[in-house]
Amino acid sequence: MAGSGCAWGAEPPRFLEAFGRLWQVQSRLGSGSSASVYRVRCCGTPGSPPGALKQFLPPGTTGAAASAAEYGFRKERAALEQLQGHRNIVTLYGVFTIHFSPNVPSRCLLLELLDVSVSELLVYSSHQGCSMWMIQHCARDVLEALAFLHHEGYVHADLKPRNILWSAENECFKLIDFGLSFKEGNQDVKYIQTDGYRAPEAELQNCLAQAGLQSDTECTSAVDLWSLGIILLEMFSGMKLKHTVRSQEWKANSSAIIDHIFASKAVVNAAIPAYHLRDLIKSMLHDDPSRRIPAEMALCSPFFSIPFAPHIEDLVMLPTPVLRLLNVLDDDYLENEDEYEDVVEDVKEECQKYGPVVSLLVPKENPGRGQVFVEYANAGDSKAAQKLLTGRMFDGKFVVATFYPLSAYKRGYLYQTLL
């Protein structure tokens, strides 16, 4: 959906009008060579979720950079408009144009605002690696997105940890940034993918382009599987692998290096059955793109049949609409009905300070005995509550607040998390 144009000065204003509504620009989330992203909120609509405004052609951009920004905008808009509706691809709310001057239009995409990126998760889990639950969750979500966009004929062409973000509302990972995407068989971008996540055939193509030469073949959707394989290997190992994948040792025998990484982790945690993940990653990292497993087939891997449980760190890092409070109720409250009802009412009253509470559950038996599960109307309220309740004193005890998967909560599945 396209909106009307509006005028901006050299710096973004606090408020702008688009789609017949007033939007508050709250903060800058990030910027690149051709675009900046801002957090925005619709004014006059209480409870409406914030959005992400991606503004192409920042102030002062001219010449080739301006042309690149316009081109990137058109490519990303076209891809997102065709790929809308899939739960693992960022939602495009609308498109509009702003003007720094009458002759300098700046294109904008209004997108859903997502949460933590896989890049940030890798920083948190540096050297120890992500949990198998998180790796499995991310792998499945990204493969679902890739299977869909490949079926639609698209290649993402810039899959990397920074372009995979968590959605607190939908409780899944989503792909963003389709500025380098192209239709398979019609590659109109010379340089694709990011160093460290670039498939061998894309590396060759980029080198030829730098030398002014043209490759005989175009890249295919297989480049996305290569990138995902590297991402999953980094999540498992807790290490950045940019230099590893460029080494002669990797080129000579990447399979042996993958085996070594998995063998090293197996010594630390022998109870985790990781060989299915190892085999899945290997199937994505064949040098020959024709041998790489397609996304749809990868979803059938035995790795996805293993019921992993999240670590407590996962439930702190990945927001959801459900909050779990630990260290609130002891056995005395659970065994006395009057005291139990009083303390549950006190907890509910406290939690409602941060937003409407849809439901509240305090199991008297395991699993989940004595834990408090609070379902909020939206993840924004849950995040605010988690931030402010963590470390608070309740009945002389420090409260520990984590998130909890909404899907598991709805099914009544209160599993024991791993420490």
From Swiss-Prot:
E.C. numbers: 2.7.11.1
Subunit annotation: Interacts with stathmin and CDKN1B/p27Kip1 Interacts with PAM.
UniProt cross-references to Gene3D superfamilies, sorted A to Z: 3.30.70.330, Phosphorylase Kinase, domain 1 (3.30.200.20), Transferase(Phosphotransferase) domain 1 (1.10.510.10)
The protein's name in its UniProt record: Serine/threonine-protein kinase Kist
Enzyme class, first EC level, given as a word: transferase
Gene: Uhmk1
Transmembrane residue ranges: none
Domain called RRM: residue spans: 324-406
Active site positions: D141, D158
